[in-house]
Design a protein with these regions (language model features):
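A short loop-to-beta-strand structural motif that recurs across blades of beta-propeller domains
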Residues: 86-89, 134-136, 180-182
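Beta-strand-rich domains and repeat architectures in extracellular enzymes and scaffolds
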Residues: 48-84
């Protein structure tokens, strides 16, 4: 009987003993960052202030994006005081207002909301991205071409151009597979690949 009690006690002691594997501490690299003052002239050879035209048709309230293409500066801006409507305005290199591209509404060529725009001079196009899964295409003169539904309806935030003219869109809401960047054909808005 004492042997049985001894074996039970021994098995209890053995089962309660755990070996924890040794964990090696990772190497810690210490990086010392030195702040170095940088001058604007380190990046630009010339800085020129260009006052933009101010009239009732082209008042800027909150600037969201600035895109420069050729001699034209495109500014994506929200209206004041509601900050609900977003407009893309074009100015020449002297700051003169040229036109607005697209507008808020329910009709053809009108959008409910856009978050970003990109300009392709090679294609004579302006692509405006709606967060609701649509892309609006206009000519550089502001005339409407079409509206395309994007492959997946996601919370689209930004749009850009690749060197070969395809479009890249970024979404804040990842799909289940983690992809949040889509590469699209600029003409058809068909999905090429996603990352």
């Amino acid at each position: 009987m004492s042997h049985i009690l001894f074996l039970v006690a021994l098995s209890f002691v053995c089962s309660s003993c755990n070996r924890t594997p040794s964990v090696e501490e990772p190497d810690v690299l210490k990086v010392e960052l030195k702040e170095t003052p940088v001058s604007v002239s380190d990046f630009f050879s010339k800085v020129e202030v260009i006052p933009l035209e101010t009239s009732d048709s082209c008042l800027l309230a909150r600037i969201l994006r600035v895109r420069v293409s050729g001699d034209t500066t495109y500014i994506l801006t929200q209206d004041y005081p509601t900050f609900r409507h977003i407009t893309l305005m074009a100015f020449d290199k002297k700051g003169n207002y040229l036109r607005s591209i697209g507008r808020v509404g329910q009709g053809p060529g009108e959008y409910s909301q856009v978050y970003d725009a990109v300009i392709s001079e090679q294609r004579n196009r302006v692509y405006m991205l709606s967060p609701f899964g649509s892309m609006y295409t206009y000519r550089l003169d502001g005339s409407f071409i079409d509206r395309k539904i994007l492959p997946q309806k996601m919370n689209f935030q930004e749009i850009g151009l690749t060197p070969d003219g395809d479009l890249l869109t970024w979404s804040a809401q990842n799909k289940d597979d983690g992809a949040c960047i889509m590469r699209l054909d600029a003409d058809s808005a068909k999905l090429i690949n996603e990352f």
